[in-house]
């Protein structure tokens, strides 16, 4: 596996990102692997490696970069858990879609990535982000998964369900 730790430039700063893909072959379809609330950490890097081993270019970014360079919750520390909830509250679908645009632009510029075939996966906090991204980039997002996603259909202007008709790819909600 090829692995890189890079910063992707966004309008709001540098987004720390882990990218992994197979050593040979390609170009590989892209997977935007969105963090869950505890943050970008080695556990997620391992999951990204498993996905990339099956033939994908996986992009795992720290979505909390606007506030912290890196974050991993320490569940035994109440202050760390409180910080996690504060960081979560600073994200919304539109911000994460802007981040996804930067991730996709980076992948599109990389010859080993096929940014015309994109999958997005989100767990819990990032489940609605995955669906929003599917609606925001319907021509390239071929699949999106929201696993135990929260706030998928709520009485809010940015509820992902309001954009269901814009999603052209396969959608998995579980």
Task: Label the predicted regions.
Residues 1-174:
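N-terminal cap/leader regions of alpha/beta-hydrolase-fold enzymes
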């Amino acid at each position: 596996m090829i692995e890189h730790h890079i910063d992707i430039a966004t309008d709001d700063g540098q987004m720390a990102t882990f990218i992994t893909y197979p050593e040979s072959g390609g170009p590989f379809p892209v997977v935007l692997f969105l963090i869950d609330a505890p943050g970008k950490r080695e556990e997620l890097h391992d999951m990204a490696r498993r996905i990339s081993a099956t033939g994908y270019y996986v992009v795992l970014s720290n979505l909390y970069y606007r506030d912290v360079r890196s974050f991993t919750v320490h569940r035994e520390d109440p202050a760390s858990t409180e910080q996690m909830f504060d960081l979560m509250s600073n994200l919304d679908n539109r911000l994460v879609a802007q981040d996804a645009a930067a991730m996709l632009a980076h992948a599109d510029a990389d010859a080993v990535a096929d940014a015309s075939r994109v999958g997005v996966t989100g767990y819990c906090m990032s489940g609605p982000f995955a669906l929003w991204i599917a609606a925001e980039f319907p021509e390239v997002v071929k699949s999106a998964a929201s696993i135990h996603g929260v706030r998928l259909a709520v009485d809010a202007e940015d509820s992902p369900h309001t954009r269901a008709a814009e999603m052209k790819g396969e959608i998995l909600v579980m």
